[in-house]
């Protein structure tokens, strides 16, 4: 038997398709999302509808974004779902979530079993729309969830950590074994909840500066920040900002990265 075939659909590797089939896990995720009628719920990558069906059962309407043409057509003809779904057959990386929120007249509740091959860039795409999002629940590779929730001074702490925690409160929800999927992935999975901050704990004037600094620091994470960020800050400036120049990227907190970004923005702004 071909283990890439599930419910008559052949899982496409290029789309990173692994279909959830464990009812306990499905029920646990739906309980964590806790959808309520009237909310603007958006699912990314509904696939064969393992999560779509129980969520839609609690809703009058929901929106789904599915890249696979065959799966989108299958959902459109699903007897229990077709009248409840607005289906966008497109790449979620190209979706304007602010427009979806404006159309709904409220912030979005986004969830999905994300294809692991695009999960990180997709989250960065979503971070740019956090003003339009109430919360997000995602099934991800466990290693990615570990990075999202990491603290400073750990090997899993990186640019994704800093940017995710800048935008959101990040909460691990559930660990999921490979046996919960068809075909079974070669890695463990986990569900995470991301709640965009209503008030930023560490406001940054220009988030592009934060992105630039974190990219530069973590691209050279074995170097001290005196070296990795040497073209942006002198050792004396780092010390004045409360950062030891001999620390490495993983030793700098989210708050400290935000402080660096704001200082650099201030230096780049022409004085009146």
Swiss-Prot record:
Stored CDD domains: AdoMet_MTases (cd02440)
Keywords assigned: Cytoplasm, Methyltransferase, RNA-binding, rRNA processing, S-adenosyl-L-methionine, Transferase
GO annotation terms (biological process): rRNA methylation
Localization annotation: Cytoplasm
Catalytic activity: adenosine(1518)/adenosine(1519) in 16S rRNA + 4 S-adenosyl-L-methionine = N(6)-dimethyladenosine(1518)/N(6)-dimethyladenosine(1519) in 16S rRNA + 4 S-adenosyl-L-homocysteine + 4 H(+)
InterPro entries in UniProt: KsgA/Erm, rRNA_Ade_diMease-like_C, rRNA_Ade_Mease_Trfase_CS, rRNA_Ade_methylase_Trfase_N, rRNA_adenine_dimethylase, SAM-dependent_MTases_sf
Top-level lineage group: Bacteria
Entry binding sites for S-adenosyl-L-methionine: 18, 20, 45, 66, 91, 113
Enzyme superclass (EC): transferase
Gene3D superfamilies tied to this protein: Ribosomal RNA adenine dimethylase-like, domain 2, Vaccinia Virus protein VP39
Pfam families attached to this UniProt entry: RrnaAD
E.C. designation(s): 2.1.1.182
Chief place of localization: cytoplasm
Listed GO CC annotations: cytosol
Gene Ontology MF: a single term: RNA binding
PANTHER family registered for this protein in UniProt: DIMETHYLADENOSINE TRANSFERASE, DIMETHYLADENOSINE TRANSFERASE-RELATED
HAMAP family in alphabetical order: 16SrRNA_methyltr_A (MF_00607)
Function: Specifically dimethylates two adjacent adenosines (A1518 and A1519) in the loop of a conserved hairpin near the 3'-end of 16S rRNA in the 30S particle. May play a critical role in biogenesis of 30S subunits.
Family statement drawn from the similarity comment of this UniProt entry: Belongs to the class I-like SAM-binding methyltransferase superfamily. rRNA adenine N(6)-methyltransferase family. RsmA subfamily.
Designated name of the protein: Ribosomal RNA small subunit methyltransferase A
Species whose genome carries this gene: Yersinia pestis
Lineage of source species: Bacteria, Pseudomonadati, Pseudomonadota, Gammaproteobacteria, Enterobacterales
Gene this chain is encoded by: rsmA
């Amino acid at each position: 038997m071909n283990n890439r075939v599930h419910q008559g659909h052949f899982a496409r590797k290029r789309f990173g398709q692994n279909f959830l089939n464990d009812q306990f896990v499905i029920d646990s995720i739906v309980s964590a999302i806790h959808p309520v009628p009237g909310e603007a719920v958006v699912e990314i990558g509904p696939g064969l509808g393992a999560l779509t069906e129980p969520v839609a059962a609690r809703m009058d309407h929901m929106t789904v974004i599915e890249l696979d043409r065959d799966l989108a057509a299958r959902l459109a003809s699903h007897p229990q779902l077709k009248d409840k779904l607005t289906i966008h057959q497109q790449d979620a990386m190209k979706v304007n979530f602010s427009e979806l929120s404006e159309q709904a007249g409220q912030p979005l509740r986004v969830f999905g079993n994300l294809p692991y091959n695009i999960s990180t860039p997709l989250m960065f795409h979503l971070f740019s729309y956090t003003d339009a999002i109430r919360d997000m629940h995602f099934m991800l590779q466990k290693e990615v969830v570990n990075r999202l929730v990491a603290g400073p001074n750990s090997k899993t702490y990186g640019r994704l950590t800093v940017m995710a925690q800048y935008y959101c409160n990040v909460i691990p929800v559930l660990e999921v074994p490979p046996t919960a999927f068809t075909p079974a992935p070669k890695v463990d999975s986990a569900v995470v909840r991301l709640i965009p901050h209503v008030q930023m704990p560490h406001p940054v004037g220009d988030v592009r500066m934060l992105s630039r600094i974190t990219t530069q620091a973590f691209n050279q994470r074995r170097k001290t920040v005196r070296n990795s960020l040497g073209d942006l800050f002198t050792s004396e400036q780092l010390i004045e900002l409360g950062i030891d120049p001999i620390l490495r990227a993983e030793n700098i907190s989210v708050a400290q990265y935000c402080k660096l970004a704001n200082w650099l923005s201030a230096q780049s702004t022409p004085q009146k």
